[in-house]
Amino acid sequence: MTDSFYGYDVIVIGAGHAGSEAALAAARTGAHTLLLTHNIETIGAMSCNPAIGGIGKGHLVKEIDALGGAMAHAADAAGIQWRTLNASKGPAVRATRCQADRALYRAAIRQMIEGQARLNIFQAEVDDLLFEGDTVCGAITHTGLHFKAPAVVLTAGTFLAGKIHIGPTQYAAGRMGDPPATMLAARLRERLFTVARLKTGTPPRIDGRTLNYTAMQEQPGDAPRPTMSFIGNSASHPPQVSCWITQTTERTHEIIRAALHRSPLYSGQIEGAGPRYCPSIEDKVVRFAEKNSHQIFVEPEGLNVIDIYPNGISTSLPFDVQLELVRSIRGFEQAHITRPGYAIEYDFFDPRGLKASLETKAIAGLFFAGQINGTTGYEEAAAQGLLAGLNAARHVRGLSSWTPRRDQAYLGVLVDDLITHGTNEPYRMFTSRAEYRLQLREDNADARLTAIGRDLGLIDDARWAHFNAKQEAVARECERLSAFWATPGNALGREVKETLGVTLSRETNIIDLMKRPELDYAALMRVPSLGPGVDDAQVAEQVEISVKYAGYLNRQSEEITRQQRHEATAIPLEFDYAAVRGLSTEVLQKLQHIQPQTVGQAQRIPGMTPAAISLLLVHLERMRRNRVA
C-alpha cells in the first residue's frame, strides 16, 4: 500500500493560473489533491502583464467565478486600476479589466490554496510521470520521489523545454529566473503526442521614477469601480492608481529597423510561432511599416514597487538595442531598465489530441491545461485549469466528465475550438469567436453556470445562497414592474409624460417601456410611482437586459435549440470511419485524425459537409439498432 504522504486522488503539476484553479477545483469537489510546484513562492505568479480581464478574457474570468474559481477573487483583492471596456456598446461585448498588484494577486491565490481542504502543496521539480501501460498513475520528482494518483493534471506553462532569447543570447529557462522542465519535456516527447513549439515574449521593465509622466496622457480608472467576482465588493479593492499612455516615435522605428538582423525573430533563431494579437514591437514595425507610431500603455506593477510594465513593446532584441529604443519613446528619455525584455520558446501539444474533458486521448487519466494546449493568457489558462481539475476528480470517482457547450460558455467555445481545429499559434479568446455572444455575456455568467457548478460540487453554500438571492430579486423586480400599466389618461401615464417626456398612445405595460432605446431602468425609477427601485446594481442590470434584449435572446435560443438536435450525439471512441460508405477521402482523413467525440464536434471540422454528417448519422443509427437487436 502507498504511504498516505505519497498517495493522492489527483496530482496537479505546476502552480500558475491553470494549476492553481485545477488544484482548487479538484479539492473542492472532494478529491485528495497534491499540487507540485518547483517553487512555492511563485504560486499564482503573473509572469507577463500585470492585468486580469479584457475583451473575451473578462468573460472567462466571470465564468471561472460563476463556477466557484479563484481568479476573480484574487483580482478583486489585487486590482489597483479598474475599467469597463466597451462600456458604450451592447452588453455582449462589455468587459471588465483590472490592473493588478503582482504581490497582492500572488498572495491572494496562495491564501486560497493554503486554505482549501484536501489540498496539499509540495515543492519539487517533476522529471517524469508514472505509467501503467497507457494509463498515468503518478509523478516522479527530480530527487526521485514517487507520488501516486490515478489522475494527473499537467499545467507546465512555458516550462517544457523552455528557452529564453535576448538577441543572439539564448539559454534554457522556464521564465526569467526559473529553471525549465527539460527532463519532463524529453519524457513526454517519447509518448504518442504531437509536439510543436510556440513563442511568447515580454517587454523590458522600467523604473517608474525615471519616467516623465507630463509627456504622457493620463488614463484614470473608472468610478465607481466594478468588481470581477459576482460576490465581490469594490470597497475591498486596494487604492486605485492611474495608468498612462504614450507612443513610439519615428526614431524608435529607425532603431528597430536598423537592428532587425540582430533579432532572434528575424535571424531564424526562434522556431516557434508567436501570438498574433500580442506581437513584439519589432514585429509591429515590420508588419505595419506605414504607421509612424504605436501606442504604449504604461502600467504600474504594484502599489509598493517601482516597476512599470510598458505594454506594447514586447521584444527579444539585444539589450543595447532595447535600451536605445526605450529611451526614444516619449516620456522615457531618461528611463532606467530594471529587467530586459525577452522571448521564450516552449513545447506545446496539439490540442486535437485531447477529449473535451481535457483528458489526453493517448494516456488515460492524464489531463492538460493552459499553454501546453497552445493557448496564451492567464484567463484562458485558468479556465482550462478549472475544467481539467474538475474532470480529473470526476475521472477518479468514475463519474462522467463535464464540458460546457459553445452556447453555454466561452470556456465551451475555447475547448471546442482547440480540440476541433487545433492551433499553430498561441490561441487567445475574443468575443468574436462565439456564435451566441448575446447569450454569453459577462453579466449573466452566474445565471448560465452557477447552478451547474452546484450540481458538480464546485459551489459552496455561501455562494449558492448569494446566487439564489440575486435570482429571486431579479424575478421579484420584473414581477413588480409587470404589474404597472400606464394609459394616456391615467395617473401613471401622466407621471411618465411629466418625468420622462414620453407620451403614450395606448395602454402600455411599464416593463415594455424599457424596450425603447432611449429608456433604461434608471430612467424608469425616476417616475415617482415606480421608484426608487432596487439598490443592487447587478439586479437592476439583469432586469433591464432581460427586457431590452428579450426578442434577440428568444431568437438566439430558438437557433440554439435547432443546432442542438445532434450536438450531443456521441461517437464511440473506437468508431471505424472507414466503414461509413460514401465519405470523401478528405473528410475521412479529417475524421480519422481528429476523432471527434460528438456529431456536433464533427460538424465544426473545417471542410465537413452536410452530406457527410448525414452519412455519419445514418451509420450511427444503424449501429444503435444493431446493438438493440
From Swiss-Prot:
A GO cellular-component term linked to this record: cytosol
Residues noted as binding FAD in the record, renumbered to the chain: 14-19
InterPro entries: FAD/NAD-bd_sf, GIDA_C_N, MnmG, MnmG-rel, MnmG-rel_CS, MnmG_C, MnmG_C_subdom, MnmG_C_subdom_sf
Cofactors named for this entry: FAD
Binding, NAD(+): 274-288
Pfam families, per the entry: GIDA, GIDA_C_1st, SAM_GIDA_C
Annotated keywords: Cytoplasm, FAD, Flavoprotein, NAD, tRNA processing
GO molecular function per UniProt: flavin adenine dinucleotide binding
GO biological process: tRNA methylation; tRNA wobble uridine modification
Cellular compartments annotated: Cytoplasm
SUPFAM superfamilies, A to Z: FAD/NAD(P)-binding domain (SSF51905)
Source taxon at top rank: Bacteria
Family, similarity comment: Belongs to the MnmG family.
HAMAP family referenced in this protein's UniProt entry, alphabetically: MnmG_GidA
UniProt subunit comment: Homodimer. Heterotetramer of two MnmE and two MnmG subunits.
Function of the protein: NAD-binding protein involved in the addition of a carboxymethylaminomethyl (cmnm) group at the wobble position (U34) of certain tRNAs, forming tRNA-cmnm(5)s(2)U34.
Protein name stated in the entry: tRNA uridine 5-carboxymethylaminomethyl modification enzyme MnmG
Species assigned in the record: Xylella fastidiosa (strain 9a5c)
Lineage, highest ranks first: Bacteria, Pseudomonadati, Pseudomonadota, Gammaproteobacteria, Lysobacterales
Annotated gene: mnmG
